[in-house]
């Protein structure tokens, strides 16, 4: 059975760099499933208030990072803030075509047209276009669509493409050479296209 191109799995959280560094560390250590569960639920390495929240957020971050390889995980764990956040961003794009296509089709167009901002209404228009492209896309309630928008716009603030979460002003971002080298060496053409929308 065909899978929908667009899913709501990005709604579980923004890039969460400090926590993603911890998850990348566990992946690099090659922990067993039991060791993973112990670290997340017993040691509470993410410092969450409930085991359920810790499990849910760690699962999202793990699924994101596992779309890439150990070289990128090392950038996340050990890199500078800029390199690490861009490495997590690259993994998030590969993990979620809902995020990737928004960058490629909407954010890129705003930069190309020299428009100064990214109004929230563009997200609603984008979701309508997604449904036209993908008949299998789930029909989401308004609350879910708004939550997804919150998450995507927060990610764009974290990476620097949006400088002000109130006015949604756009800013060009230069992706670090380390991240770009990894993406080129691993032939991540979709991610390369989506991550460089301000060029």
Curated annotation (Swiss-Prot):
Pfam family, one: BrxA
GO annotation terms (biological process): defense response to virus
Function of the molecule: BREX systems (bacteriophage exclusion) provide immunity against bacteriophage. Part of a type 1 BREX system which protects against dsDNA phage. This system allows phage adsorption but prevents phage DNA replication, without degradation of the phage DNA. Methylation of bacterial DNA by PglX guides self/non-self discrimination.
Keywords assigned by UniProt, alphabetized: Antiviral defense
Protein name as it appears in the record: BREX protein BrxA
Species in which this protein is naturally found: Paramagnetospirillum magneticum (strain ATCC 700264 / AMB-1) (Magnetospirillum magneticum)
Keyword Magnesium: no
Disulphide-bridged cysteine pairs: none
InterPro entries named in the record: BrxA, BrxA_sf
Family per record: Belongs to the BrxA family.
Record bears the keyword Transcription: no
Domain of life, per lineage: Bacteria
């Amino acid at each position: 059975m065909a899978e929908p191109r667009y899913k709501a799995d990005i709604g579980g959280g923004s890039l969460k760099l400090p926590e993603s560094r911890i998850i990348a560390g566990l992946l690099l250590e090659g922990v067993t499933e039991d060791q993973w569960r112990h670290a997340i639920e017993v040691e509470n390495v993410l410092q969450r208030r409930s085991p359920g929240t810790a499990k849910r957020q760690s699962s999202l971050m793990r699924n994101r990072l596992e779309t890439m390889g150990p070289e990128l995980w090392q950038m996340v764990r050990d890199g500078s803030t800029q390199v690490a956040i861009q490495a997590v961003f690259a993994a998030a794009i590969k993990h979620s075509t809902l995020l990737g296509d928004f960058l490629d089709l909407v954010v890129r167009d705003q930069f190309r047209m020299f428009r100064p901002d990214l109004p929230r209404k563009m997200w609603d228009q984008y979701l309508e276009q997604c449904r036209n492209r993908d008949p299998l896309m789930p029909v989401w309630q308004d609350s879910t669509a708004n939550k997804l928008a919150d998450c995507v716009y927060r990610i764009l603030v974290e990476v620097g493409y949006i400088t002000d979460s109130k006015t949604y002003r756009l800013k060009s971002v230069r992706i670090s050479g380390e991240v770009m080298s990894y993406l080129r060496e691993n032939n991540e053409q979709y991610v390369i296209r989506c991550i460089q929308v301000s060029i």
